[in-house]
Amino acid sequence: MRIAEITTPDLRLHHRETDSHTHHPLLSEIELLIQQSEAISKDQPLPQSLPISLRQFLTRLSQLAPFPDNSFKLTIWKLSFRLWNACVDLANAASLQSSLTSAENIANLRHVAADMLFLAKDVTGVPSPTIKSSLFYYKTGLVYHSLKKFDLASDCFERATEIVSKIDIAKISDAGEKKLFLDLNLARSRTAWEISDRNLAVTLLNRAKNLLFGSPDHYKSLSNQFLAFGKSSLSRGDDDCSLNDALRLMNEALDLCEKGLGTAKTREDTTEFTAMRIKTLRFISAVHLQKGEFENVIKCVKVLRNGGNGSDGADQHASLPVLAMKAWLGLGRHSEAEKELRGMVGNNDIPEAVWVSAVEAYFEVVGTAGAETAKGVFLGLLGRCHVSAKAALRVAHRVLGESRGGDNGSRIRANVVAQLVSDERVVALFASEAVTKERKAIHSVLWNSASDHFRAKDYETSAEMFEKSMLYIPHDIENRVFRAKGFRVLCLCYLGLSQLDRALEYIEEAEKLEPNIACSFLKFKIYLQKKEHSCAIGQIDAMTSCLDFSPDYLSLSAHEAISCQALPVAVASLSKFLSFYISGKKMPTTEVVVFRTLVTILTQDIGSETEALNFMLQAQSRASKLGTECFFGLGETGKREQNWFAATCWNLGSRCGKEKKYELCGEFLRLASEFYGYIDTDESGEDKLMICRSIILSVTAMIALEKQTKSALTETQVKLAAELLVRAGKIMSSSLSDGKDCIMEPELIFMYTLLAYDIHGRLNNSAFQLLVVKTFAGSKSCHYNYLLQLGIFASQSPQSNPDVSTFALNECLSALIASASPEYPTIALIIRKLISIASVHKGDTDDEEAILKMYKQAYRIMVGLKEGEYPTEEGKWLAMTAWNRAALPVRLGQFETAKKWLSIGLEIADKVTGMDTYKACMQDYLAGFQTKVSSA
């Protein structure tokens, strides 16, 4: 504010005296600068050089003290007042521009004006010059304080205090001057508080107690300042020191209120002191609450509510139920706390933020047990007054808390919130566009809670929360995707609950809003769990038609089908998966893995061997087309895959063979030979051996099928068998030439020989038949039993070959005779067989001689044997057949030939037990025959 010019008679006299004197040059310079400050327009900023220049001239002026006369001082006084008034005008203009730099310059200019007035403070003729000088410093200090220039403010306040300290307070009668003494102390105290000199600040307030002068206004000012410092300490922190300071300062404020009531002379003063006292008590309650002194809080609240100690009525401030509730909670008396909380519903003066905070505080302490109370309070408030969407969001979020789901407490909280947010009034709070942000937030809160319960496998609670979150998604085009997402997760929840029909309803709704692969896949899962396999297989085709389809979903579908034991569905899914490889599309999984998985699935299901064979054939075809490294993979990985396919074919072929499924057995074993052929043969030759085994058993299965079906092999089948055996023969020949025949089982070589004989007999290749048997006879694997079987088979099969049979049986006979302990029954059998073959296929005299030689060989074998060592029946057969062979030569007159047969028959009979009667007759006949021949 501007300070009026002094117009007393004495000053007018001094003014005339001053005008009669010539101004000092320094004063003239100062006046020129003041005129500049007065001439500055409102739109112009104060030059920064002006305060500096004035300060320099003032410094020079101070060097002239003491001043020569009173008129000189009066001139300085007037210049100071002019400068001050100019500062007031400049400050008013600067306030419109809000320039901090300009405000600081004006404050500096004020400081110059105060210093100028201080130089002439002992001027005569001016009332209370000392008080006025002090006032300039006080007001300048206030400006510096507002600019947060606390050091400069403190300097000004201290200078003002020094000036008035020389005045006897008892002699002051003016109320304004008395107020200045108090205000100076309060201002110094505030500045000291700001620069964290708390002790000085409190000391100055305590000094101010001596400057009250019984004035109600003084009591109010000092009490308010104590309260302000107490609030500052309370807000500074929760440490005991800060809280104790706050309590001490507030008690001082309360004490001053009590004393101030005694000085009140008007109803207005009494009302103000009462309001201050109530306010201070509330803050004291807050401090006790912070300190955990809950009993003291309750006492304060009771005092306030009872309206005691001079109060006209009970205090109904909105903070009281909150303070009381928190205190009761601190004392563990939850029922009283609940009463306070419910009582807030009927208090219309309680702001929304306060009761929401109270609900949060109550629930934080009581926890899950307070969920219903929190809901009831909120709905009660909803029916009483307007509640914002933000408040509803806060309550829902607080009740849900940070629970991760899965426990009973979080389930109860979720159920309470579900009831709360599904209330039509709550939903209506979020309906307008103005609360879009809050609507998204509460949807997120509900969604996250549902997700937590879903992860904890509490699908029932999760479904409820997801359903409630759908209430906060608008039914417009922009939110179609969000609604579809909600329906999809609800489908997952009901899948988890095995409520498949409801899950299907939700996913169909989602598909209407946003048809995509996720919806299609979930429908597939539902069909699987409903065991509607045909629908599931149909859904596979639906998935592939989706715009966002990825082959990964087919792999995932197969896994789902396997887990549900729906093997046909898994096969259908993987079969579809294979079609993408044929098209050349880049896939995340190698083709061989898909084939392997398919075959593995099919082998688990007995009766699916035909399908498994088809996929094995496809795999072999793809391997041939792409190359083994490309199809199976490189290195050890590829080798493992090749081994798996080969071994699986072998195992399936063996299983089918045991089950007499010879057609499948043959195909699997043939494929096994192909897969084993892909493997790089190791030094041990094990893989080559497996190729031979597979081929030999494959051809064996073909012949077994022929016998089973009683249908002869076709020409194509015979040629295929021949080709397979040629391949096996080459491998065996290679192994034998390398000296590795020891690793091949003799039985395997025998089977090969037998099969080769059979198949080439069908091709009328008798020369090869003899060659293959001779080759076998010359190998280390040959045993007389094998030769015996070959000989018998060659003599009895449809493709009989007497040359092969004779060779095999002769080789067998030689081996038996050469053994240390010959098996004479077998020898006898072979001799009979050889005689029979020769008898059937004889063509000339040489054959007759060969037969005779066999009989003689049999006789030589029998010579020296113990009785019965050579089979008696076979001996009799030899003797009788030899004797009977003489009949034809006798009739033909071939007496010499007849004699040979009669003689060998008699010789053999002589070695056979039990032929004595026959032998006597034979001897008589032979003697008579010889006589007859001699006489002829």
Curated annotation (Swiss-Prot):
Alphabetical keyword list: Chromosome, DNA recombination, Meiosis, Nucleus, Repeat, TPR repeat
Stretches forming TPR repeats: 134-167, 223-260, 278-311, 443-476, 484-517, 879-912
Keyword field contains Nucleus: yes
Top-level lineage group: Eukaryota
GO cellular component: chloroplast; chromosome; nucleus
Cellular localization per UniProt: Nucleus; Chromosome
PROSITE patterns, per database record: TPR (PS50005), TPR_REGION (PS50293)
Effect of a null allele: Short siliques and low fertility due to defect in meiosis.
One annotated GO biological process: homologous chromosome pairing at meiosis
InterPro entries: Spo22/ZIP4, Spo22/ZIP4/TEX11, TPR-like_helical_dom_sf, TPR_rpt
Keyword Acetylation listed: no
Function according to Swiss-Prot or TrEMBL: Required for meiotic chromosome segregation. It is involved in interference-sensitive crossovers (class I meiotic crossover) formation, in both male and female meiosis. Is specific to recombination events resulting in interference-sensitive crossovers (class I meiotic crossover). Not required for synapsis completion.
Record-given protein name: TPR repeat-containing protein ZIP4
The species this protein was found in: Arabidopsis thaliana (Mouse-ear cress)
Gene this protein is translated from: ZIP4
